């Protein structure tokens, strides 16, 4: 059995919960969730009235009447809810088409079964309104009795009668509005008559009465007026009620918006009831019994007030429909159609903001000391003045909240009564529905923002005041207690002394009744020795009364009794000729009036949490039963575009207004208000279900739009950050500004991890993360998709897009938990499990089908450009995917800017492209591409090229000696031209053969350039890695200083960065192994100087295995000199062909094939080891040497000699360069360790003349 816990311990344990730190630092930009605390209801509805035996009996009786009237008002509220939320049942029931229909009996039976409970409710409603009118008129009759007319009637009683008047007005309007009620009753009646359910005359009569009651408009009002007019002097009592409402309204003696609007409705409907055949309000005004000009002023200021739900009432309508309006029309300004400034919310915003700022600052001071810092003193240590300040602060806060909520509802009401049209708003279509014209098209941008801001202020302040609820509650109870006790024990002591002394028994009995009702004496009873009780003066030493201090409020009955009894003392009416007021002294009257006025708000403040909720309740912005009724069944429910909460939320999202972005959740909270109201006040599950369905849809839309915006915003931010600053400034000089994105407040929204909506806790951050991840993936997918639909030059744009996405990912990762960028990229690149991705495949695809056959390399610029004369077919690519700007560079302006940047990379393939390819493909991708390129080279060298080599070898002259210098360059040219005639005239040489060689050359060049780019990347890697591997640059030392000492200091400085020892000390075995391997690999890479190009050349050498490349063994055992059997002689012949200058309109071999052709030829020669004999025995070089010597210029067989020689010289330089590069790579494997070349000695050749002898 657990040990017993005392109440004190339990309470202290609960208090300790406040000390618990809550983990998240989520910014508060949403209203408070529904409280899990109980809201205690201290209102006993006078059930405890009989306990106050010491009170004046008359007021206890009045409390009894009050109690039953309050119950009737509650019942009236239930009927109002029933009527307002009534949905037509008969529309859903199948109709009987004709009398011969076989299942009509069944249909009628079902109709009766379904509708009977509903019709019973209507019947009860009819009885209720009958009873309520009788009850009300009975009270009026009692109070207007000639004997009672001068009697005092309490304000509370008059206000209750006013509430009755309001109830009748509301019920009548609801009954008038609901056609579906009448339709349902008619359907029931038809079915019941057919089934002969109503056989007895009484039920038939009742049914008929109900039909008439429902059919007659204003039936309740008419009945009420008829019954009131037979009561003599009824208008006097109604005048009292109206005057009280005017007084309350003028002095702001109301707290919740519904109380304020009730006062106005009672004024209007009260005047309507008074102005009939018996009495005339204008005569009463003339007698100063009522003040119509004041009421007119109020009705002018506030022309439309909420009646019930989305039903509104124009207050002037009560006046316009009254009996004597026409002849007094000119007296009313409220009846004119001009709009009141009250409804221009934008003008009111300055004042609202000022009030908000002032109050929030004041509240923050108290909040910080009470709640946040915990430095607030213990409750018992506060002074009365401090409690009073908190009390005033609570009241002021509630009044502000109520004022703002009322303001929102009044603007909304005005708009519902005054829908827009196509003339007032050009965006409003002709066929717009009534509700749509009242909501969707009826607000300007400024008005929507103003509403959003006010709603945010209301809900934000509600949060702050809710947090201080316990502090406020204690201060309120303490202050109310102190005020009541001080007033009853101290302030009323002097009037009591006077009353006893002057023997004013009535006043004495009332004052003593008050004291007995509320006094909480320190000793437990009234001091017996108090001289005031004997009507004597206090002794000179004074009579000290100690008033205790507690935090206990009075009960509702207690407060009512005290206020009513005090009121009876200062009232202008009294049962006798002389009023009690005249017997009291001036200061006493002022004290009583002051206390009476202040105590008006005590009931509200004692129920602080409930009042706070009522003052912030904006639930009616969603309900639309009245407008649904107007559609006559065409609409079951309106779409979200017409729903106020979504209109405001969507407006913030659509305008992307930064200052409003943090308010977006407050607009969504309107659904919480409506759902709470539907369940707790309307008690209608179907309304809650409709709200829930709308919330599901709206929240999806909200997350979808918000995530899209956030992604687009950060994408533009990334695009702007990475955009070349020089381009931006250049554009600015040209007058085209590329704007940076305006700052927005998405961070606060991204930190929301538990948004409260309809009782669900939603992790907004997670939902946005999901959407943004999808958008990120789509962006990467699109970037790769664009690359796949373009040629190799677009690889630079791909890299740019990936960098922007990487930056976007980095910016978003501050707030969202996204997958790593590399993981996303691999997924988009289809490279998670596959060995190579889409980019690698497309790079090879482009190389194979477009780059190798169609690009010409220029060694001077180190670039490939597209050939002027393509030999391959046009390559068909996929269509480029369409994309919105946020999936590319961010915005249209950025897309344009980046397109112009990447446009300069479009017409060539060079180092920038190769660097990007290296980065994107990585070692694995490069290896795959090179392997595939080697296959291409192999198929060409062992296929078509080999065939051409064989064919051309056959048409080569068997022997072609180099002629002697004496022949002169023209002669030599003619000799070679004649010797190589078959080669020169070979048609396919300059087309297919050269094209195939160009492809081989381009492939080899691609490998070479990739390796050069890769080396740059590697060096960069190595330099970045150096500090972490203890590889430090040698330090500069002055003379006389020791290097090793300085290096040691430097090493110790960088020791914390040295990764391997660090991991060995702190890491797991697996981490240690990885670190060691990584370190070793990086160092090895640095030392080895590995060459990939050498491996590629070695591989290509193995492809040249056919004997035709090398020819037969030389007959002299050394080398072939004059015979044309080796490849280098064939290449010399080819070189002779392309060195012949072309005609004016023909393309040169450089234009058609670029340097790739020469790279292919020279590479084959070098790999065959024929480069030196080629340099010595080449036909063109020989011609060059001779021409250089004799300097002749002739045209031999249409070939200008000098021009040809110039071309030969150019190609000689190119060949030498290529052969040197290739030699360097091939010899790099031999290493530096073999400085001595291997020399083979041959016998010197013997001249023929000597050989024979």
UniProtKB/Swiss-Prot annotation:
Report any Pfam family annotated for this entry: CYRIA-B_Rac1-bd
The Gene Ontology CC terms held by the record are: cell leading edge; lamellipodium; neuron projection; perinuclear region of cytoplasm; postsynapse; ruffle; SCAR complex
- InterPro entries, sorted: CYRIA/CYRIB_Rac1-bd (IPR009828), Cytoplasmic_FMR1-int (IPR008081)
Residues annotated with Phosphoserine modification: 583
Which residue intervals make up region (EIF4E-binding)? 724-732
Q: What is the effect of changing residue 724 to A?
A: EIF4E-binding reduced by 20%
Question: Can you state the subunit structure given in the record?
Answer: Component of the WAVE1 complex composed of ABI2, CYFIP1 or CYFIP2, BRK1, NCKAP1 and WASF1/WAVE1. Within the complex, a heterodimer containing NCKAP1 and CYFIP1 interacts with a heterotrimer formed by WAVE1, ABI2 and BRK1. Component of the CYFIP1-EIF4E-FMR1 complex which is composed of CYFIP, EIF4E and FMR1. Interacts with FMR1 but does not bind to related proteins FXR1 or FXR2. Interaction with EIF4E stimulates FMR1 binding. Component of the WAVE2 complex composed of ABI1, CYFIP1/SRA1, NCKAP1/NAP1 (NCKAP1L/HEM1 in hematopoietic cells) and WASF2/WAVE2.
What is this protein's record name? Cytoplasmic FMR1-interacting protein 1
């Amino acid at each position: 059995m657990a040990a017993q816990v005392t109440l004190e311990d339990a309470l202290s344990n609960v208090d300790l919960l406040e000390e618990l730190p809550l983990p998240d630092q989520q910014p508060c930009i949403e209203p408070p969730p529904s409280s899990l605390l109980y809201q205690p209801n201290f209102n006993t509805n006078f059930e405890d009235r009989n306990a106050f035996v010491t009170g004046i009996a008359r007021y206890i009786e009045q409390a009894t009447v009050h109690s039953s009237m309050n119950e009737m008002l509650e019942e009236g509220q239930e009927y109002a809810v029933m009527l307002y939320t009534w949905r037509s049942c008969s529309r859903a029931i199948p109709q009987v088409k004709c009398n011969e229909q076989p299942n009509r009996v069944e249909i009628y039976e079902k109709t009766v079964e379904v509708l009977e409970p509903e019709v019973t409710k209507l019947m009860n409603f009819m009885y209720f309104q009958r009873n309520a009118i009788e009850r009300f008129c009975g009270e009026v009759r009692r109070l207007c009795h000639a004997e009672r007319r001068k009697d005092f009637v309490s304000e509370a009683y008059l206000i209750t009668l006013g509430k009755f008047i309001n109830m009748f007005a509301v019920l009548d309007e609801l009954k008038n509005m609901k056609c579906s009620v009448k339709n349902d009753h008619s359907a029931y009646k038809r079915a019941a008559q057919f089934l002969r359910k109503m056989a007895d005359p009484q039920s038939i009569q009742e049914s008929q009465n109900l039909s008439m009651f429902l059919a007659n408009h204003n039936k309740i009002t008419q009945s009420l007026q008829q019954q009131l007019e037979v009561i003599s002097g009824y208008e006097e009592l109604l005048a009292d009620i109206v005057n009280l409402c005017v007084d309350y309204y003028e002095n702001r003696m109301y707290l919740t918006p519904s109380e304020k609007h009730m006062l106005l409705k009672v004024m209007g409907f009260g005047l309507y009831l008074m102005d009939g055949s018996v009495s005339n309000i204008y005569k009463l005004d003339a007698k100063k019994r009522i003040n119509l000009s004041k009421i007119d002023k109020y009705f002018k200021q506030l022309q439309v007030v909420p009646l019930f739900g989305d039903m509104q009432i124009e207050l002037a309508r009560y006046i316009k429909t009254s009996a004597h309006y026409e002849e007094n029309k000119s007296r009313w300004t409220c009846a004119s159609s001009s709009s009141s400034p009250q409804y221009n919310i934008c003008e009111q915003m300055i004042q609202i903001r000022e009030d908000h700022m002032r109050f929030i600052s004041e509240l923050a001071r108290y909040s910080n000391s009470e709640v946040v810092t915990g430095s607030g003193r213990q409750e018992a240590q506060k002074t009365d003045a401090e409690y009073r300040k908190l009390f005033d602060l609570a009241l002021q806060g509630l009044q502000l909240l109520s004022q703002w909520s009322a303001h929102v509802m009044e603007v909304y009401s005005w708009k519902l009564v005054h829908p827009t049209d196509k003339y007032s708003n050009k965006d409003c279509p002709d066929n717009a529905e009534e509700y749509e014209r009242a909501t969707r098209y009826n607000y300007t941008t400024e008005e929507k923002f103003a509403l959003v801001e006010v709603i945010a202020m209301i809900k934000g302040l509600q949060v702050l005041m809710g947090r201080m609820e316990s502090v406020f509650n204690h201060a309120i109870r303490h202050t109310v207690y102190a005020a009541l006790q001080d007033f009853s024990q101290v302030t009323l002591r002097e009037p009591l002394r006077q009353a006893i002394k002057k023997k004013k028994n009535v006043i004495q009995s009332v004052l003593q009744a008050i004291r007995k009702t509320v006094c909480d004496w320190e000793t437990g009873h009234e001091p017996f020795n108090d001289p005031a009780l004997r009507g004597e003066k206090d002794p000179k030493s004074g009579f000290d009364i100690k008033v205790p201090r507690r935090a206990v409020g009075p009960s509702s009955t207690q407060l009512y009794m005290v206020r009513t009894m005090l009121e009876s003392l200062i009232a202008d009416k009294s049962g006798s000729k002389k009023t009690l007021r005249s017997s009291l002294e001036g200061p006493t009257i002022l004290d009583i009036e002051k206390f009476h006025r202040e105590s008006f708000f005590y009931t509200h403040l004692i129920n602080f949490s409930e009042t706070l909720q009522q003052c912030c309740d904006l639930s009616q912005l969603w309900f639309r039963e009245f407008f649904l009724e107007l559609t006559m069944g065409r609409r079951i429910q309106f779409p979200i575009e017409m729903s106020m909460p979504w209109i405001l939320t969507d407006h913030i999202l659509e305008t992307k207004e930064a200052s409003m972005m943090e308010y977006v959740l407050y607009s969504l909270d309107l659904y919480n208000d409506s759902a709470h109201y539907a369940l707790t006040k309307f008690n209608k599950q179907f309304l809650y279900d409709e709200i829930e369905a709308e919330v599901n849809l709206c929240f999806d839309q909200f997350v979808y739009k918000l995530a899209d915006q956030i992604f687009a915003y950060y994408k533009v931010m990334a695009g702007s950050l990475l955009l070349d600053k020089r381009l931006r400034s250049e554009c600015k000089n040209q007058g085209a500004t590329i704007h940076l994105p305006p700052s927005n407040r998405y961070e606060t929204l991204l930190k929301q991890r538990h948004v409260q909506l309809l009782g669900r806790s939603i992790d907004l951050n997670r939902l946005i993360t999901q959407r943004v991840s999808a958008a990120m993936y789509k962006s990467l997918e699109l970037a790769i998709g664009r690359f796949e639909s373009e040629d190799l030059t677009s690889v630079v744009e791909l890299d740019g897009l990936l960098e922007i996405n990487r930056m976007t990912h980095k910016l978003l990762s501050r707030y969202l938990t996204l997958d790593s960028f590399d993981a996303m990229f691999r997924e988009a690149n289809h490279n998670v499990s596959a060995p190579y991705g889409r980019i690698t495949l497309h790079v090879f695809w482009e190389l194979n089908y477009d780059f190798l056959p169609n690009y010409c390399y220029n060694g001077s610029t180190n670039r490939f450009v597209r050939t002027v004369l393509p030999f391959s077919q046009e390559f068909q690519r996929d269509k480029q995917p369409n994309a919105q700007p946020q999936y590319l560079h961010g915005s249209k302006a950025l897309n344009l800017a980046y397109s112009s940047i990447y446009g300069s990379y479009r017409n060539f393939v060079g180092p920038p492209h190769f660097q990007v390819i290296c980065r994107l493909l990585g070692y694995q991708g490069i290896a795959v591409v090179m392997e595939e390129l080697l296959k291409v080279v192999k198929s060409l060298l062992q296929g078509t090229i080999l065939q051409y080599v064989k064919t051309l070898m056959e048409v080569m002259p068997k022997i072609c000696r180099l002629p002697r210098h004496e022949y002169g360059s023209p002669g030599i040219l003619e000799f070679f031209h004649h010797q190589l005639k078959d080669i020169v005239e070979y048609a396919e040489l300059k087309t297919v053969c050269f094209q195939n060689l160009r492809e081989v050359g381009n492939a080899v060049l691609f490998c070479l350039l990739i390796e050069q780019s890769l080396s740059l990347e590697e060096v960069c890697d190595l330099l970045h890695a150096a500090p972490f591997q203890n590889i430090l640059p040698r330090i500069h030392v002055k003379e006389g200083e020791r290097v090793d000492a300085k290096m040691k200091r430097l090493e110790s400085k960088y020791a914390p960065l040295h990764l391997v020892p660090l991991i060995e000390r702190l890491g797991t075995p697996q981490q240690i192994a990885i670190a060691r391997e990584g370190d070793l690999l990086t160092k090895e890479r640095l030392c080895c100087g590995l060459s990939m190009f050498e491996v590629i050349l070695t591989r290509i050498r193995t492809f040249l295995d056919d004997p035709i490349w090398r020819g037969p063994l030389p007959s002299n055992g050394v080398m072939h000199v004059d015979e044309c059997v080796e490849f280098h002689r064939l290449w010399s012949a080819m070189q002779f062909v392309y060195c012949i200058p072309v005609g004016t309109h023909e393309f040169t071999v450089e234009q058609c094939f670029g340097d790739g052709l020469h790279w292919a030829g020279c590479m084959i020669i070098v790999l065959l080891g024929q480069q030196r004999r080629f340099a010595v025995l080449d036909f063109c070089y020989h011609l060059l040497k001779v021409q250089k010597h004799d300097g002749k210029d002739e045209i031999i067989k249409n070939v200008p000699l000098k021009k040809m020689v110039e071309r030969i010289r150019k190609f000689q330089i190119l060949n030498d360069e290529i052969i040197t590069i290739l030699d360097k790579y091939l010899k790099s494997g031999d290493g530096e360790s073999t400085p001595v070349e291997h020399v083979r000695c041959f016998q010197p050749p013997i001249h023929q003349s000597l050989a024979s002898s």
